[in-house]
């Protein structure tokens, strides 16, 4: 595929994979410990404020892992190593994200809903988002909005497309990498009913990051996608 020439030598794929796994594992340990401290299990009844603390801790682990990789195995500049740049044209990604949520994802689930009507219902597909919204009120609604619309898109694009995909593209076939990272992105969310939609969305943001050579477009697309999904259940 045609994509921009890298001005910085990408981080070695093996290093990126190890850094990804180590940071992800650290995030899980932190999450479990914090949930235990708050006396929570991480289920649907977990308060938004607790969820916010746990998520921020996990994201801290992700970003710390990326910083360590960049410092010891890259240029020392995360901006250059992970393509953390946003240009005005990247704002088009907001529209792409909205279309992905309203059109593309619906198309993905049409045949699935026809084949398994009791499984792939609108109620089931929106359950996770609705449970989050139902738990929020007042100030925690603002917290939820910030986490879903800004926190998750920025950190996830940094971690999946910046750290992992960017390094793998320098060594392996573009198509294989885009598909593989999108599949990993979907599976790690641990919500099987959402796997098809998350996988297709992963392909969209993966292509955006690869074709532009930076994370701005994929981050904006992710923001537009999450914002639309949240507004649909408010």
Regions found by a protein language model. Give the residues of each.
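N-terminal start-of-chain detector that recognizes signal peptides
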Residues: 39-42, 52-55, 120-125, 156-157, ...
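Transmembrane helix-loop-helix hairpins at the membrane interface
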Residues: 100-107, 129-234
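Membrane-interfacial segments
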Residues: 34, 38-42, 72-77, 112-120, ...
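Juxtamembrane helix-loop-helix connectors linking adjacent transmembrane helices
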Residues: 39-50, 76-152, 170
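N-terminal, membrane-interfacial amphipathic/helix-forming hydrophobic leader that caps
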Residues: 1-88, 110-111, 227-234
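Residue-level signature of transmembrane alpha-helical entry/exit and packing/kink sites
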Residues: 12-20, 46-55, 89-94, 140-145, ...
């Amino acid at each position: 595929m045609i994509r921009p020439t890298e001005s910085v030598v990408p981080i070695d794929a093996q290093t990126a994979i190890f850094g990804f796994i180590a940071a992800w594992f650290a995030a899980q340990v932190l999450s479990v410990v914090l949930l235990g401290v708050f006396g929570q299990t991480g289920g649907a009844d977990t308060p938004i404020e607790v969820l916010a603390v746990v998520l921020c801790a996990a994201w801290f682990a992700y970003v710390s892992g990326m910083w360590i990789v960049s410092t010891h195995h890259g240029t020392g500049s995360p901006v250059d190593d992970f393509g953390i740049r946003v240009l005005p044209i990247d704002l088009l990604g907001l529209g792409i994200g909205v279309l992905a949520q309203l059109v593309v994802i619906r198309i993905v689930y049409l045949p699935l809903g026809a084949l398994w009507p009791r499984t792939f219902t609108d109620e089931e597909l929106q359950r996770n988002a609705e449970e989050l919204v139902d738990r929020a009120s007042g100030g925690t609604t603002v917290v939820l909005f910030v986490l879903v619309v800004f926190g998750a898109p920025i950190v996830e694009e940094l971690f999946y497309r910046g750290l992992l995909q960017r390094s793998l593209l320098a060594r392996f076939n573009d198509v294989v990498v885009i598909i593989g990272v999108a599949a990993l992105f979907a599976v790690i969310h641990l919500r099987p009913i959402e796997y098809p939609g998350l996988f297709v969305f992963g392909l969209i943001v993966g292509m955006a990051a690869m074709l532009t050579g930076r994370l701005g477009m994929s981050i904006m697309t992710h923001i537009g996608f999450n914002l639309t999904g949240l507004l649909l259940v408010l």
